[in-house]
């Protein structure tokens, strides 16, 4: 698998340097970011190859590599859902994605999840995007810091969360209660569907409750990563307010 760009490659070096097989850096880049990356690679015994940018362009046709490309081993799932839940200290904070098949949306959701301090992102194996090169690049390093757990049966996995007293709240247009009116418990999993489609019926039925994100303009829905940012950071805001009380 290829990963590219300074954020993604630096994160992989810090989180799993042993998975980096080859590292290529634009021979003409001698700025601070390039030097820092080379020093980090050397720290882990990785000898970067300085090559012409044309070679990087051939390796990465999108040409959004910023002068750095790495060939890495695909990382196997770190743990299953039960193991993840066992490892969480304190109230669980999770994001469930149902039907999100666009890798850029997945990457953006991972990035938001990392910023908000989410313990993991959960998605179904048969109705979701895998963690591919585009998702990793869009995540800007978050793919290495936030576990992405793909489960066989999402409805059953939601039941597992609820068995552990984790409240599952889904977002849905037209839900009776808005996000800003709803109580958000300490242990929560937010369930979001793809833009324009929303949560599948069975997923909706498994949620403890549904809330809507108020819309004041003409558009009918938000991009899933934008919606994720709204609900996750509203949760963070309330938790911090509760801590100060």
Regions found by a protein language model. Give the residues of each.
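N-terminal positively charged helical leader segments and presequences
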Residues: 1-84
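Structured adenosyl-cofactor binding patch, chiefly the S-adenosyl-L-methionine
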Residues: 10, 115, 130-142, 201-245
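RNA substrate-binding interface of SAM-dependent RNA methyltransferases
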Residues: 15-18, 46, 87-177
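Short beta->alpha connector loops at strand-helix junctions that form conserved
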Residues: 52, 73, 98, 124-125, ...
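A short acidic, often aromatic-flanked loop/helix-cap motif at beta-alpha or helix-coil junctions
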Residues: 54-59, 76-78, 154-158, 176-177, ...
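Short basic, glycine-rich beta-strand/loop surfaces that mediate nucleic-acid
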Residues: 59-73, 139-143, 147-151, 185-193
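Active-site/ligand-binding-proximal alpha/beta "capping" segment
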Residues: 169-225
